[in-house]
């Protein structure tokens, strides 16, 4: 049975047990203020090399300053996670970043991703945000997932996040 709950700090490293594998056939690029879809094939076997080491400390810091971490479980197995940053960003400081949203490969298209996204959106609104900011992996499936939920290209990409992830598609959505 699939259940959900907030994660504990000591469970952050369990995020890396999520099966991030994916076959990608199309990638979006941001060019001249528009999205351009290009055919490119990648077989992603899991988390990129070095990503777990790089991001564990970033996620722990996010947790320690009040970030919201929510996991979906199949019995005891973590199969999906959403992380909402607690620091406000944006020109008007009215956006919260959806720092992470991943669902294990076998559980995609099951509704788990939609549920995690919706819970994060509600949590952002409860915390006083007007919008959620998303730096999305540029794969067609990821970008379309967010577009189906009303996300659109960020009017003004966050300079810090854009510098960290210039290849990502920077999106925002009203909460």
Please place each PLM-identified region on the residue numbering.
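Short polar/acidic secondary-structure junctions
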Residues: 87-89, 137, 159
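Conserved acetyl-CoA-binding loop-helix of GNAT-fold acetyltransferases
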Residues: 100-103, 109-122, 147-148
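Short glycine/proline-centered loop/turn elements that form peptide/ligand docking sites
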Residues: 113, 117, 139-142, 159-165
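Conserved GNAT acetyl-CoA-binding A-motif
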Residues: 124-137
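Conserved catalytic-core motifs of GNAT/GCN5-like acyltransferases
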Residues: 133, 147, 152-168
């Amino acid at each position: 049975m699939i259940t959900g709950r907030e994660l504990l700090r000591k469970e952050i490293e369990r995020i890396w047990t999520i099966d991030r594998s994916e076959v990608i056939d199309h990638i979006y690029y941001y060019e001249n203020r528009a999205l351009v879809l290009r055919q490119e094939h990648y077989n992603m076997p899991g988390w990129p090399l070095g990503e777990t080491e790089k991001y564990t400390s970033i996620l722990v810091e996010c947790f320690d300053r009040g970030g919201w971490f929510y996991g979906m479980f199949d019995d005891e197995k973590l199969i999906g996670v959403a992380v909402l940053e607690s620091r406000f960003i944006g020109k008007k400081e009215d956006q919260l970043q959806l720092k992470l949203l991943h669902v294990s490969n076998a559980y995609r298209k099951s509704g788990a991703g939609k549920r995690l996204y919706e819970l994060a959106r509600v949590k952002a609104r409860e915390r006083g945000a007007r919008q959620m900011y998303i730096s999305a992996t540029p794969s067609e499936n990821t970008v379309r997932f967010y577009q189906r939920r009303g996300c659109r290209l960020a009017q003004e990409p966050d300079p810090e996040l854009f510098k960290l992830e210039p290849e990502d598609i920077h999106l925002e959505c009203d909460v």
